[in-house]
Regions:
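Loop-centered beta-sheet repeat module
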Residues: 227-278
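Short helix-loop-beta junction
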Residues: 246-249, 295-296, 336-343
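Secretory targeting and sorting signals
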Residues: 1-54
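Acidic glycine-/aspartate-rich tracts in secreted/extracellular proteins
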Residues: 165-167, 249, 285
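Glycine-rich phosphate-binding "P-loop"
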Residues: 91-98, 233-235, 287-288, 296-302
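Flexible, glycine-rich surface segments
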Residues: 271, 279-281, 285-327
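Acidic, Gly/Ser/Thr-rich repeat motifs that build Ca2+-stabilized beta-propeller blades
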Residues: 2, 32, 43, 51-227, ...
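Predominantly five- to eight-bladed beta-propeller fold
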Residues: 242, 291, 296-305, 388-402
Length: 402
């Protein structure tokens, strides 16, 4: 079966944040309209409380590279709507939802999520079953591939990422838990998974991890600490780290990956803001964190913390605006970073608070809207149609969740 998709990565005065957001808001045209649209709407929300600081000297705009995963020319995308779609009317059958923002229902608890370039479909991982499902509105989810995983505890099929040359090779990279370790594998539809990087320690808990391509030859791999914070500080262990993997083909003796960041708790998500920073979310016994690795390697740790531990998960980063899925927090948290320092000094705004339950995966659609996957079957209070993939309406105002 052939599919295509896109990928889905010090305190300063508040004026720097506001100027940076205004710079982003002026960068919403061109072939990367989806990224600009996300930054536009999130940025507008976060700007609501900004004072009128001097707006001179904007940083140059570097557009995010995209994978050309479809040979067809995609239509120009309209700006995202802030108005929820009208509810469906008439009798509903099994696994049908009255909310038209719901894209797919009756999934097993989810792992990673990505969107396809048509803007109307995506791929979502089922964490416990190891299935990769193609989902679209008003369409029954279809299994694209399946990987043997150990879905006990918090392990299983944890995240997926598209090969940079997917249009030619149809390869999907995945971060998975097996009976002996956590590992990175790759798989094509209808094929079996091949190991790319193995030997990452696994545990009864703390197996959370994530994948994101920073460049065609660089796969960022976030690994959990297996419930043992000491291994996250151990340079000899691959657990509790952000790794840069350059060997992307199956190899009996792959080279050891570069350790970019140590001290990770239970991995949440990794997202790349091209040319600016790589962002990492993780969960510790004391707090949940958002950490930043600048393009020059400078680490801001943490860039933001949540002492109430809302369960940070997948993330999206666009021109200094970061969106983070929250599990126990039952929302998406949107944060704005100063474009020069990466500092976050303004409390996040909350999106879709208490609307769909616990959220885990997060992706960007080609129309600029966020897609999220729920994890209610294992972490929340599941309804009859859980778990789901939903398209989240963007905020028109601001609210706080800290």
């Amino acid at each position: 079966m052939t599919d295509s998709r896109t990928r889905r990565g010090t305190l300063v005065r508040r004026g720097g944040i506001c100027r940076g957001l205004r710079n982003v808001l002026g960068m919403t045209t061109g072939r990367h309209a989806a990224l600009g649209a996300l930054a536009l709407v999130l940025g507008t929300s976060l700007l609501a409380g900004c004072a009128d600081f001097d707006e001179s000297t904007a940083s140059p705009f570097t557009p995010e590279p995209t994978n050309q995963a479809s040979a067809e020319v995609q239509p120009e995308n309209p700006p995202p709507s802030t108005t929820p779609p009208a509810p469906r009317t008439g009798p509903l059958g099994p696994c049908q939802d009255a909310d038209t923002a719901v894209i797919a229902t009756c999934l097993d608890t989810t792992g990673g999520l990505v969107t396809l370039p048509d803007g109307n479909s995506g791929l979502v991982a089922e964490r416990r079953t190891g299935r990769i499902m193609q989902v679209a509105p008003n369409t029954t989810p279809v299994e694209v591939a399946k990987i043997d995983v150990d879905g006990s505890g918090d392990g299983g099929l944890l995240d997926i990422a598209l090969s940079p040359t997917f249009v030619e090779d149809n390869l999907i990279y995945a971060y998975v838990t097996t009976g002996t370790d956590n590992r990175v594998v790759r798989i094509a539809p209808g094929d079996t998974a091949k190991e790319v990087l193995g030997g990452i320690p696994r545990g009864a808990s703390g197996n959370g991890g994530s994948l994101e391509f920073a460049a065609p030859d660089q796969l960022m791999v976030l690994t959990g600490d297996t419930g043992n914070p000491a291994v996250a500080q151990d340079p000899g262990s691959l657990a509790g780290k952000l790794l840069r993997v350059r060997s992307l083909t199956p190899n009996a003796a792959p080279p050891r990956p570069e350790v970019v960041l140590s001290g990770i708790g239970n991995g949440g998500g990794v997202c790349v803001d091209p040319g600016i920073a790589t962002w990492v979310t993780d969960r510790t016994t004391l707090e949940d964190r958002l950490q930043r690795v600048g393009s020059d390697g400078t680490v801001t740790s943490p860039a933001w913390t949540w002492p109430d531990r809302p369960g940070v998960g997948g993330c999206i980063a666009v021109q200094g605006v970061v969106a983070v899925a929250l599990g126990a927090g039952k929302a998406i948290s949107a944060l704005a970073a100063d474009p020069g320092t990466g500092a976050i000094t303004t409390a996040p705004s909350a999106v879709a608070k208490d609307t769909y339950g616990q959220l885990g995966g997060l992706a960007l659609g080609s129309d600029g809207l966020m897609w999220a996957s729920t994890i209610n079957k294992t972490a929340g209070e599941p309804g009859p149609n859980d778990d789901k993939v939903v398209k989240i309406p963007m905020p028109s105002g601001s609210g706080g969740i800290d």
